[in-house]
């Protein structure tokens, strides 16, 4: 059941009751997202560096800058910085992630963010989707292919599958997907077709919303 839902201009934020699964263990992934007037990648990289103390094995960012572009690497934030230094990063909306491996070994493919099948959606996720295997089998039967071993990639494919089947908005597709997944999570979703919108939700995993003057942070 949705406990609280906020729409603040171009940010949709949902909070679900913190009823944790019996075998729940906190996962120490880091999430940073930004929309506003500053260069998003600078804000996100700075935020990820402040989360390094939590421990992680890979890192990545997604930016909307002419397309929905994902940059990710195994290793430290400093390695990601070197990887993106020659990229065109001009964007005022984006999200970043530091990963602590659960499903799938530490490598570039398993790092977040993850694309949907059409690459029109991207997601970052902290937590564990306990029923991801059954969801994945359902999607495989529909012809989906996956590049990683993660539950997170299954999650974003599932969201897009719902959006296509129901012909609904991205925020409604996320809401419907969250009624089907089992586990604890904090997520942020971006959509190529909604270039000024960040969608976030949490259940059991922490996620903090910051509101500035004409800008928003997670």
Model-identified regions with their sequence ranges:
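Proteins with a high burden of low-complexity, intrinsically disordered sequence enriched in S/T/G/P/A and R
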Residues: 3-4, 8, 26-28
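Leucine-biased recognition of intrinsically disordered, low-complexity hydrophobic segments
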Residues: 2, 11-12, 22
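Intrinsically disordered, low-complexity sequence elements enriched in Ser/Thr/Gly/Pro
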Residues: 2-3, 17, 52, 95
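Conserved short alpha-helical segments that host acidic/polar catalytic motifs at enzyme active sites
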Residues: 24-218
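Short intrinsically disordered, low-complexity coil segments enriched in acidic
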Residues: 1-4, 164
């Amino acid at each position: 059941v949705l406990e609280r839902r906020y729409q603040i201009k171009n940010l949709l934020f949902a909070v679900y009751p913190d009823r944790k699964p019996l075998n729940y263990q906190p996962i120490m992934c880091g999430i940073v997202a930004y929309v506003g007037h500053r260069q998003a990648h600078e804000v996100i990289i700075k935020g990820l560096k402040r989360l390094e103390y939590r421990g992680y094995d890979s890192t990545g960012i997604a930016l909307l800058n002419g397309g929905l572009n994902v940059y990710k690497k195994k290793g430290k934030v400093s390695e990601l910085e070197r990887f993106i230094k020659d990229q065109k990063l001009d964007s005022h909306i984006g999200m970043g992630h530091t990963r602590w491996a659960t499903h799938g070994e530490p490598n570039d493919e398993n790092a977040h963010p993850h694309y949907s099948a059409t690459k029109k959606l991207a997601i970052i996720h902290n937590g564990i989707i306990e029923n991801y295997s059954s969801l994945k089998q359902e999607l495989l039967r529909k012809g989906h292919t996956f590049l990683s071993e993660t539950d997170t990639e299954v999650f974003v494919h599932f969201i897009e599958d719902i959006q296509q089947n129901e012909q609904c908005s991205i925020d409604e597709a996320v809401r419907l997907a969250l009624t089907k997944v089992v586990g604890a999570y904090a997520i942020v979703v971006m959509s190529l077709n909604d270039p000024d919108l960040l969608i976030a939700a949490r259940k059991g995993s922490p996620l903090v919303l910051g509101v500035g003057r004409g800008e928003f942070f997670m």
